[in-house]
Amino acid sequence: MAMVVSTWRDPQDEVPGSQGSQASQAPPVPGPPPGAPHTPQTPGQGGPASTPAQTAAGGQGGPGGPGSDKQQQQQHIECVVCGDKSSGKHYGQFTCEGCKSFFKRSVRRNLSYTCRANRNCPIDQHHRNQCQYCRLKKCLKVGMRREAVQRGRMPPTQPTHGQFALTNGDPLNCHSYLSGYISLLLRAEPYPTSRFGSQCMQPNNIMGIENICELAARMLFSAVEWARNIPFFPDLQITDQVALLRLTWSELFVLNAAQCSMPLHVAPLLAAAGLHASPMSADRVVAFMDHIRIFQEQVEKLKALHVDSAEYSCLKAIVLFTSDACGLSDVAHVESLQEKSQCALEEYVRSQYPNQPTRFGKLLLRLPSLRTVSSSVIEQLFFVRLVGKTPIETLIRDMLLSGSSFNWPYMAIQ
């Protein structure tokens, strides 16, 4: 945090160009009588007690002097970007810690953003996190300087090695953050990977239809239970929780499938989908096989990166906390949770895989392609035999509200 700290002056010192210079003409203040107890002086006291003449003359040590007025004025300076309380002058302008950190991060990482509206979004305390494009645009418009970020020295509150800065500027120790946040993500898993089923860990083993359906049910239930127990998610409004899971359940399912090395052989998947039960055109078979191929590709690409459990947990949190869900009551808060998860993953990868500088980027690049796996196809392949025509969104809502007491309509998970 860049703070403006005024150096302390003795009230008897002359202040050129101000009325404070009159203080030197005031009659000397008599010292304490002999034998009086000695009182230690502090910078706040500024030496002997101020006389009324000194106070009126503008001694900076007094509560009513111009130094105090200047400090009070500084405390009321607003951030030129969002209007929040300014913490000082950063990169050429008075800004809050949030806008300072956002501008610094955007410039140092050379980030580019896209506006989903008309590139004229309101940027204030309540909307500053909703459009990064317009926020950066306003930072530059009000005069924040890119070159000040590139050439400026590291401010005192810049996170050093072993620290991690949240978007509100509060530094946290990196290791305590990882051991806290990521460990909670890991502990939220209702099933360790090995408990998804022994067959799941044998990629070459062709699973039967019933085993495939049961494994899929476990993975979907695991995704919802995990979300219910991770930090911050239970604090969201229940409508927001449902909206987030309805949008992201299929992506979480693919990540779980990759994590447990779920076998994805075409024949049993087609059988599980019930496509053999009724005549179908060749085009429909080809279309389903193409969807299965896409699913297989996404799983294999994740497996090729040898993603560890902590990375999977962070990836799932990044996927879950998306502002793309419809009807969210607090979009900015959800975005901040996604950013925390992303930053935690970045710090973890840097500390655990220092010899793989591109690993973090490769992991993030896998996330957008998860949506290429159709959620309706996942329903058809894995859940029709279990729930029939019951919408998967209904099951997710029931799982979220029922918790561990949830039972499948047609098959209980043992």
UniProtKB/Swiss-Prot annotation:
Signal peptide: none annotated. Pfam families: Hormone_recep, zf-C4. InterPro entries: NHR-like_dom_sf (IPR035500), Nucl_hrmn_rcpt_lig-bd (IPR000536), Nuclear_hormone_rcpt_NR2 (IPR050274), Nuclear_hrmn_rcpt (IPR001723), Znf_hrmn_rcpt (IPR001628), Znf_NHR/GATA (IPR013088). Residues 76-151 bind DNA. GO terms for biological process: anterior/posterior pattern specification; blood vessel morphogenesis; cell differentiation; female gonad development; fertilization; forebrain development; interneuron migration; lymphatic endothelial cell fate commitment. Its main location: nucleus. SMART domains: HOLI, ZnF_C4. Belongs to the nuclear hormone receptor family. NR2 subfamily. Ligand-activated transcription factor. Activated by high concentrations of 9-cis-retinoic acid and all-trans-retinoic acid, but not by dexamethasone, cortisol or progesterone (in vitro). Regulation of the apolipoprotein A-I gene transcription. Binds to DNA site A. May be required to establish ovary identity during early gonad development. This is COUP transcription factor 2. It comes from Homo sapiens. The gene is NR2F2.
